């Protein structure tokens, strides 16, 4: 079992914050500081976004964070260089669209992840049918390709998505972009329970989660939550103490 899956399988109430690499007043020089803060608060893993000019799955908060990072000339190459010097016991998960990876070179990208704390990849615009672009390069590495499973995904398709999944299953709690609040289907709890029965891999819920009420709800029917827009917004507004408090409360339900 790879590191990411082992870490998330060992407990319930997993909390995975999302941050945008380079969205800091000191740009990428502040990345390590943010990771250490999130680790010390009790994060199970940390999702690190790569800024992209056409972020189709991102809501306005994360899109603006990406634009701020791009304005600081943050790139995938520079992020990978920064990660080499970051030491953390918490597994890092890179969230990137496929184009930056393709432009960088897939084999070069995976090679650059060696000797870093990166243990997972999320590529939202890479469908299951095209995973062969990536998987041959990570099969023998301690890196997982994390699938996203939408609320509207038919059961037959869910089975295909989770059959050989590693790390965790990213259950998309809403239809649409990240950051939407209070748009949850009343069928969501059933959806998550059904999905969890299809796999032994931890199922984590993300998209739109912004309150402790949301966290408590989804911790009951999945292995934990991924919180993006709230974390990104609070960090941008220098509310680090709020972030720490939120995470500590979230993992102690």
Curated annotation (Swiss-Prot):
SUPFAM superfamilies: Ribulose-phoshate binding barrel
Keywords associated with the record: Amino-acid biosynthesis, Aromatic amino acid biosynthesis, Lyase, Tryptophan biosynthesis
Pfam families in alphabetical order: Trp_syntA (PF00290)
Leader sequence residues: none
EC code: 4.2.1.20
Catalytic activity: (1S,2R)-1-C-(indol-3-yl)glycerol 3-phosphate + L-serine = D-glyceraldehyde 3-phosphate + L-tryptophan + H2O
MF GO annotations: tryptophan synthase activity
The protein's annotated pathway: Amino-acid biosynthesis; L-tryptophan biosynthesis; L-tryptophan from chorismate: step 5/5
Residues forming the catalytic site: 47, 58
Gene3D superfamilies cross-referenced by the UniProt entry: Aldolase class I
A single GO cellular-component term on record: cytosol
NCBIfam families listed in its UniProt record: trpA
Subunit-structure text: Tetramer of two alpha and two beta chains.
Family affiliation: Belongs to the TrpA family.
Role noted for this protein: The alpha subunit is responsible for the aldol cleavage of indoleglycerol phosphate to indole and glyceraldehyde 3-phosphate.
Name the UniProt record assigns to this protein: Tryptophan synthase alpha chain
Species of the source: Lactococcus lactis subsp. cremoris (strain SK11)
Gene name in the database record: trpA
